Amino acid sequence: YVEKKIVNGEQVEDDLAADTRTFIYVEVLQSALNNDYVLCGRSLARGNDSNSFGSYNAEDLKTGKYERYQNELCHLNIFTWLGVIGMLLYSLIYIRSSYLAVYRSNSYFLKLIGVFIAFHWAYGWIEDTTNFDILNISLWSAIGMGLSSQFRAMTDKDFKQWVWGIFYKKKKHL
């Protein structure tokens, strides 16, 4: 699908079906192979070598490194920082939490949270940034709920009471 729009008085075409991710995968994997950090990662202090985005850091920010410290793909960031070992462990957290929430919980609501967790794991291969924001705080809270035996033991009624208890507190008269 091609969208036509007017930008600065000129007609511009945007191909909404264009592949905007493959080159990022190529850069990340090539950087890992060239710098020998496939297994254990490059550390949180470094990014992947990037011909497409590295010049900004090297030249404009004067770092001298043609690296991209963070990509818009969650799992590629984890791979760059922690390698295959870290990527597997990171994925196991998502998978275990989702599995427990879907198959080992008493609440329909927690089963939905398990599906939400599984969706985010899959979406992390396409676009799901690793930022400290409300989305990731919510995601990791959901992962914690899936891993919690207390939350999994809740019934739908218990879960509703817990949620309502967050917003409405009865005043205690002393």
What is the predicted function of each stretch?
Residues 172-174:
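Eukaryotic scaffold repeat domains enriched in small/polar residues
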Residues 80-121, 155-156:
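Hydrophobic transmembrane alpha-helices and their immediate junctions
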Residues 44, 86-89, 147:
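Short, flexible micro-motifs
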Residues 112-124, 129-169:
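Transmembrane alpha-helices of multi-pass inner-membrane enzymes
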Residues 47, 89-92, 133:
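Generic hydrophobic alpha-helical membrane-span motif
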Residues 11-82:
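Long extracytoplasmic/lumenal interhelical loops at the membrane interface
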Residues 1-6:
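Compositionally biased, low-complexity regions
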